[in-house]
Amino acid sequence: MPKTRHEPMPLEHVLREHVFLLGHDQRTPEHRHARGHLVYPATGVLSLVTPLGSWIAPSNRIVWIPAGFEHQHRAHGRTDMRIVFMAPSLAARLPEHPAVLVMTPLAREATLTLTGSERRSAGVRSRLRRVIIDDITTAPEQPLHLPEPHDDRLRAVVALVEEGMSSPLTLGRLGHQVGASERTLSRLFQQETGMSFPQWRTQLRVHRALLLLAGEVSVINTATACGWANPSAFIDAFTTLVGQTPGQYQRSLREDARTAGAAGTGGAAGTGGAAGHGGADRSGQVP
């Protein structure tokens, strides 16, 4: 995959908001930006892939990406991606690593307004960015990070788990297939991901569930597809990580889609995948 690296840009270009429409499964090249920025999927679901692993954000979450952090986006479903670059003084209030944060109703409206088609003065835009930061920093960081292991045996296990998610195997049986003992794999998972294998697999299942539910798959069918023995176990695990039940999550996505639709797409949107976030902003500048 080609890599696009963005050199530092003048402040007036860096602090411009962007809107991009990505088709299902469309991906941007790996790239980085000179300023930290927030990425909000007003519709659809967005994955953030980095050397540290992946994060996933539906339309009731917002992603923070620090300055200089190499990353790639992947859209799940037709995704309306809004990008808001932050001045260093505001970026300092956010984590030094990528993070998924709760998108509050106030922050959502400020983001949609800031990235909307109506031109705003520099003062208004500055105040809107401050509103977003003030609001999203009141909630804790969301545990939606899936660490990426680097050991070849763990990578082989990950591939097997992803391929057979609806029929999960024990770590011992997975180890037999990749030529490693259960004890070795268990130790490696803890060392490389900071999680036990069951914790990591639950995180992976919830990531997959977020995508299926966003695609209007039923709760029962999602539970089965992701390998849970019964819907109750799925609902408990999902609620623990996401902070709402699968049904509440689906309802909130529908409401967010209506809100984003009423606000419009905010002007010209990049749809290609050749550079950076996949296109130019309203002024023709590549972000």
Description of each model-found segment:
Residues 52-67:
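Short acidic-glycine-tyrosine-enriched beta hairpin
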